[in-house]
């Protein structure tokens, strides 16, 4: 589903849109790679800067007799809360929830949930600072 005032710039790759839910007032800037096979919810007032990847799938590697490339994929939903800014070049991995009023710093790799009212950055992403209420 798609809310109001959703701006998707040229050069954005979107896959499995039937599994993606957009809120209102969302901007997705050029060269983003967004796939929703595992389920993706982007709430309202979200800005996704250029060159961000959002992935809801991953490779498993449990069958040692099969190349990793051919092991089954896993699927986990990603949730991006209200009032979130995801800065350029960030990677949001499957199974992550970014809670309300959060900032993901440029170049971060988010592999765990992001607390509300906070800034996360780094590889892997860690809490940098709580935002003042």
Give the label of every model feature segment.
Residues 7, 85, 93-94, 103-105, ...:
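A generic "structured core" feature
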Residues 97-121, 125:
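C-terminal/domain-terminus segments
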